[in-house]
Amino acid sequence: MSRRKTTPSAGIVYRLETTKKRDLSVEEIRSVFEAGGDELVDMFLLMFLLIGINVSDLFALTKENIVRGRLEYDRAKTGRHYSILLHPEALRIIEKYKGENKLLRFSEHFRNVDVATVMINKKLAKVRPGLTTYYARHTWASIAFNIGIQKDVVSLALGHSFGVRVTDTYINADLSRVDEANRRVIDYVLYNKK
């Protein structure tokens, strides 16, 4: 008697779903900057100015994360270290909403990051229906690429690997390329300078 092998997934067809587009056009992000002034909307704008920092990372920041004019932190999702030059536009928001124990007071007002995220997203939805914190990172990346910043610099700014993890250990990335890319994105969005 022969045994027929079966697999639990036999006959199942898998579809790869593409990631939902979560980027704003330049005009749309400009309109969010124009609507700014509310603390929670300004947290979204700060996320954009900081190359799309995640809410959980922003929530966890303390004053010790600012070192010699740079924001130094390890991303909670990946553990990867980030070092972002604090441009004046970001510093203005940080100064306006500085916390006592945390870098930003919104981190002290909410019980946890999940509550903070829900509240930010509710406020953003009033500015633009469907807008969430995820848009900050996606929008920064799309604008950077569309104004001519090389894809490898965009990837470096977002903390993506260069493909071979072993190679990454040998590469000492020039952060000035990321600093310049972020300055170009900010200048284009806020001052229409390409």
Predicted feature residues:
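Short, polar N-cap/turn motifs at the start of nucleic acid-interacting alpha helices
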Residues: 65-70, 130, 149-171, 192-194
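Basic, Lys/Arg- and aromatic-enriched nucleic-acid-binding interface segment
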Residues: 3-55, 137
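Active-site/catalytic core of tyrosine-dependent DNA strand-transfer enzymes
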Residues: 25-29, 87-129
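Conserved tyrosine-mediated DNA breakage-rejoining catalytic core shared by Y-recombinases
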Residues: 11, 50-53, 59-96
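Catalytic-site neighborhood detector that most strongly recognizes the C-terminal catalytic loop/helix
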Residues: 23, 75-79, 158-184
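Short basic/aromatic active-site micro-motif
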Residues: 129-147
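A short, glycine-centered helix-capping/turn motif at helix boundaries
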Residues: 46-60, 147-149, 160
